[in-house]
């Protein structure tokens, strides 16, 4: 996963509260079997409106920092919501509050969910709307957002901050314990040699396997009448 320490990019003001995951990416797009390529599905219903913020030339395909209202990412649990934001280009989402599951999914996928007071978000909206296409700088090192001459602090979980700054996804974290895992597997194989094994399909068990009905059985009545069930 790509490291995130400091990001300078176009800030996008999204003056909407209680944005749920179905608004971020409709369920119809969840049928895809890949983890990427969801940028076209981000805010799909809203982007059909020509006046939606991401359809404005100052923001279309350029946004990297999204500034939204409280309770962002509520609704059903779908990691696709974070994938869609990331695929579009957003590495940071700023809001007064986030849904817990969505917040957890951001860190796993290289997106920072930065928590700011409502008054700070309102100020950022004002600054971004006064100068569409304006760039902002987000620093995980100092936990601050700078927009023009204004610098504001944000909150981020220490563990989330550590993961993002080091670019650790779940696989990276697991591989840090590779030696411990190998040692445990070795110990388990030696101490518990009777662990169950799956029989390969080409080998048949020695005992005969009886079926409920033999191939030459012509019984057509209910199985219950034969005492089988």
From Swiss-Prot:
Example GO molecular function: 3-isopropylmalate dehydratase activity
Record flagged with keyword Lyase: yes
InterPro entries per record: 3-IsopropMal_deHydase_ssu, Aconitase/3IPM_dehydase_swvl, AconitaseA/IPMdHydase_ssu_swvl, IPMI_Swivel, LeuD
GO cellular component: 3-isopropylmalate dehydratase complex
Renumbered residue ranges of the record's region Disordered: 208-229
Gene3D superfamilies in UniProt: Aconitase, domain 4
Subunit-structure text: Heterodimer of LeuC and LeuD.
Family assignment from sequence similarity: Belongs to the LeuD family. LeuD type 1 subfamily.
Protein name: 3-isopropylmalate dehydratase small subunit
Organism listed in the record: Bifidobacterium longum subsp. infantis (strain ATCC 15697 / DSM 20088 / JCM 1222 / NCTC 11817 / S12)
């Amino acid at each position: 996963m790509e490291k995130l320490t400091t990001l300078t990019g176009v800030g996008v003001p999204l003056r909407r509260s209680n944005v749920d995951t179905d608004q971020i990416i409709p369920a119809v797009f969840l049928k895809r079997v890949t983890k990427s390529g969801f940028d076209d599905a981000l805010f799909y219903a809203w982007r059909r409106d020509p006046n939606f913020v991401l359809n404005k030339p100052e923001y279309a395909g350029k946004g990297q920092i999204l500034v939204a209202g409280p309770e962002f990412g509520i609704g059903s649990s779908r990691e696709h919501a974070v994938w869609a934001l990331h695929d579009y280009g957003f590495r940071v989402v700023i809001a007064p509050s986030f849904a817990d599951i969505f917040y957890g999914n951001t860190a796993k996928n290289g997106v920072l969910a930065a928590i700011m007071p409502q008054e700070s978000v309102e100020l950022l909206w004002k600054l971004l709307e006064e100068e569409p296409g304006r760039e902002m700088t987000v620093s995980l090192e100092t936990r601050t957002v700078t927009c023009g001459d204004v610098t504001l602090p944000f909150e981020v979980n220490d563990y989330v901050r550590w993961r993002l700054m080091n670019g650790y996804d779940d696989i990276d974290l697991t591989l840090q314990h590779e030696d411990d895992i190998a040692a445990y597997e070795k110990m388990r194989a030696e101490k518990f040699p009777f662990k169950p094994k799956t029989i390969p399909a080409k080998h048949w068990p020695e005992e005969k396997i009886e079926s409920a009905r033999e191939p030459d059985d012509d019984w057509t009545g209910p199985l219950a009448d034969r005492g089988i069930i």
